[in-house]
Regions:
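Beta-strand-centric surfaces of beta-sandwich/beta-rich domains
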Residues: 1-6, 11-228
Length: 228
């Protein structure tokens, strides 16, 4: 583990290099590069999405540790287009406890790695995605912290679409195409408020589309987060 007095080499104002240098930066990605993770089918309302989220991030650190998880970006690359959805919308929530009652198969357990091979820091995050992921009802503490449509105008997603969520910063913006109502591939990035996932707290990305049919989205997933 790096000592607190370790020299830091980082461009001025670049938070990510500094955090990676200290061993606090992690990525979570789909277990098989090039293969998408299918979400649950026929999720046409927010209520249905809460029971079967696209992504669930649980902070498994002990409460006494005060170690938080801070998502910096989430990138979804469409590998299977949905059928029938009039929009592609994502709602972001925070809640107490581990809401996952049924974890998905191994294909839905994201691979977590520290991006600094010189650091011994290990993540206590539990990050799941896709079909088979089931959660209990939200508690009275549940908070909606974000809500945004990424595809509009009655057009379903297109294989190759990239949907990126950036939290608390304008850094890491991918090339953007806001032509989200046509049938061409679109790369869409939106900024969201900073999110803090405390110990024994759960953060979820719930995807839903009005009139979505039995053919669901499939996504390659990449997440960058800080744990400290």
């Amino acid at each position: 583990m790096l000592a607190g007095t370790s020299p830091i080499v980082a461009p001025i104002l670049n938070r990510d290099v500094l955090l990676a240098d200290l061993g606090y930066y992690f990525t979570a990605i789909s277990p098989t590069p090039g293969t998408g993770i299918l979400e649950t089918a026929s999720i046409s309302t927010f209520a249905l999405a809460e029971a079967a989220p696209v992504i669930s991030i649980y902070n498994g650190n002990p409460v006494a540790s005060s170690v938080n998880i801070y998502p910096l970006f989430i990138r979804l690359t469409v590998t299977q287009a949905n059928a029938g959805g009039l929009t592609t919308r994502f709602t972001l929530t925070l809640d107490q406890g581990q809401r996952v009652t049924t974890a998905p198969a191994a294909t839905g357990v994201l691979t977590i790695n520290n991006t600094n091979m010189g650091s011994g820091n290990k993540s206590q995050a539990q990050i799941y995605a896709g079909t088979g992921l089931v959660t209990v009802a939200a508690s009275s503490q549940r908070r909606i912290v974000g809500n945004q449509s990424f595809r509009n105008g009655g057009v379903v997603s297109v294989i190759g679409d990239v949907y990126q969520f950036n939290f608390g910063s304008t850094e890491q913006l991918d090339p953007m195409s806001l032509v989200e109502t046509g049938t061409a591939i679109c790369n869409v990035t939106y900024n969201f408020a900073p999110v803090v996932i405390g110990p024994n707290q759960n953060f979820q990305v719930q995807g839903w589309a009005a009139s979505q049919g039995a053919t669901q989205h499939g996504y390659e997933i990449e997440i960058g987060f800080v744990e400290k």
